[in-house]
A protein has these predicted regions:
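Gly/Gly-Pro-rich "capping" loops immediately C-terminal to redox-active cysteine motifs
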Residues: 37, 50-118
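An acidic site on a long C-lobe helix of protein kinase domains
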Residues: 32, 44, 73, 121-125
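Generic structural signal for secondary-structure transition and capping sites
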Residues: 45, 86-89, 138
């Protein structure tokens, strides 16, 4: 069976080359998704948003919205994950958010009342996380 699996991998690479995709880029893109999946797990996004980003169900964590039908672009999502959403349970995950990195035009050192700032992810990790969410969960818009 492992020979079959290896053969499929070779065929996939050959197909990618035939249609003009740069095979090293495919591997690089996959590593970015792996990094995004790791950031999703480290930040425990599934606790609030559900294991398949379908929206949380409560319990011990706030009910986060479904990410499957979001209409935000990636840049907006990076901002939300980085700085959280003041007045909601959405925390700020960016290292240095509100202290070293300006959020929502607030002066450094000013954190909104009630804002949780775990600040465990780098900017690159947040970008990878957002890429992972879009590639894995967000449904393509209908024409």
């Amino acid at each position: 069976m492992s020979g079959m699996r290896g053969s499929l991998g070779v065929h996939a690479l050959a197909l990618a080359a035939c249609i003009g995709l740069d095979v090293p880029v495919l591997a690089q893109d996959n590593s970015g998704l792996v990094a995004g999946k790791d950031a999703w797990a480290r930040a425990s996004c599934f606790d609030c948003h559900g294991s398949m980003a379908q929206g949380g169900s409560g319990g011990d964590y706030p009910v986060g919205p479904s990410l499957r039908n979001i209409t935000y672009d990636k840049e907006t999502m990076v901002g939300i994950v980085s700085c959280g959403i003041p007045g909601t349970p959405m925390p700020a995950w960016l290292k240095g958010a509100y202290t070293k990195v300006e959020c929502y035009g607030m002066p450094l050192g000013s954190t909104p009342a009630g804002m949780t700032v775990p600040a465990i992810l780098t900017a690159d990790e947040i970008k990878a996380l957002v890429d992972y969410v879009f590639a894995t969960f967000v449904q393509a818009p209908r024409p």
